[in-house]
A protein has these predicted regions:
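Conserved catalytic-core motifs of eukaryotic protein kinase domains, centered on the activation segment
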Residues: 143, 150, 174, 208-210
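A short, glycine- and basic residue-enriched loop/turn
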Residues: 155-156, 173-174, 195
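Domain-scale signature associated with acetyltransferase and cell-envelope carbohydrate enzymes
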Residues: 1-139, 159-161, 178, 194, ...
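Beta-rich strand-turn-strand
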Residues: 116-121, 168-180, 186-190
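Glycine-rich NAD(P)-binding loop of Rossmann-like domains
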Residues: 150-161
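Glycine/small-residue-rich pyrophosphate-binding loop that anchors the diphosphate of NDP-sugar donors
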Residues: 104, 123, 154, 166, ...
Length: 213
């Protein structure tokens, strides 16, 4: 048994679900690593046709790690023709509900999303390298319905080394530049400059040139 397989079987990985994703996404055509996208137990998959995975980094879905394991169910729904781009190793902990709509694109630069996240990507979502997202976050790049005469949504871009606190909501057309810190409970809509601390409903810049580690 090779090291990759042994490591996966020692974890909470669901081998059958992982194999299903590996085949359905077409990863088997270009990757020798069955566990590049590791689907953990209690994660429900709904997979459309013709969706693809790009990049060589890894993704863990429904991982029950972290300081306070919850053992809660997760789900991933991927629409027809959607694209998942893995530019850095990423973990999404258990309890997440993630919906990637038909033809949508979601890009992970490498980071961490805590338990019970709600992610709806109907257009485009980018999460940069080294970004961490707190518990119970909600990220939606669409309102599901559209006001007559309004501009089409542009998606959401979250830069590198961004810290998003717990129970934050990030709405369509938001752009968080590198190093932004989002206080817990904020509702984010719009563009925010690098190194800013934002808070409130709606979120506003409350401090500039902050650093975190």
């Amino acid at each position: 048994m090779n090291g990759t397989l042994h490591a996966a079987m020692d974890s909470s990985c669901d081998i059958v679900a992982t194999l299903r994703f590996f085949i359905k996404s077409g990863l088997y055509r270009r990757s020798h690593n069955l566990f590049q996208v590791a689907v953990h137990k209690r994660t429900k998959l709904t997979l459309g046709r013709g969706f693809t995975v790009e990049g060589k980094a890894s993704l863990h879905l429904g991982d029950d790690g972290g300081h306070y394991p919850r053992h809660t169910a997760s789900s991933l729904r991927v629409g027809d023709g959607a694209k998942l781009i893995l530019e850095g190793n990423h973990r999404i902990l258990s309890g997440h509900q993630m919906d990637i709509g038909p033809g949508a694109e979601i890009r992970f630069g490498g980071g961490y999303i805590n338990h019970d996240a709600r992610i709806s990507c109907q257009h485009r979502l980018t999460i940069g390298r080294g970004t961490i997202i707190g518990e119970d976050a909600c990220i939606m790049d669409s309102d599901s319905h559209v006001l007559v005469g309004s501009a089409a949504p542009r998606g959401i871009e979250i830069g590198e080394h961004v810290w998003v606190g717990g129970r934050v909501m990030i709405l369509k057309n938001s752009f968080l530049h590198d190093g932004v810190v989002v206080a817990a409970g904020a509702v984010v809509s719009g563009e925010f400059p690098p190194g800013s601390l934002i808070a409130g409903v709606p979120a506003r810049v409350v401090r500039e040139n902050v650093e975190w580690r």
